[in-house]
Amino acid sequence: MSLDFYIYPGVHESGSESISFNITHNLVPMAKKAGLYEPLWRPEENYDEPVLASDVYPAIVAGFNNLVIDPENYKDLNPENGWGDYNSLVDFTADVLAALRQYPLAVVEACR
């Protein structure tokens, strides 16, 4: 099971197709601890729809900063089964943030 996080730049900005990112649900405990779960896994429950990149961006930046400031606080939550780890959540979040910065008016959606 995994999360698919979609960014639809073409809804409010022209010239682009959807961008998608995927990550395992095994990292939910780590994402919750960092403050990333609500904006990435459940944006539609926490923001007015349509949810825009600019809506979730501040919370994802804060969660990302939590991850990188204190890695040891999160590495203990690496899944025992080996599916996903701290580094994959950092990379996933960095990639999502780059796309959100590029398309601040894009609609975002999470499929769980």
Per-range role (PLM):
Residues 1-112:
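Acidic (Asp/Glu-rich) sequence patches and key acidic residues
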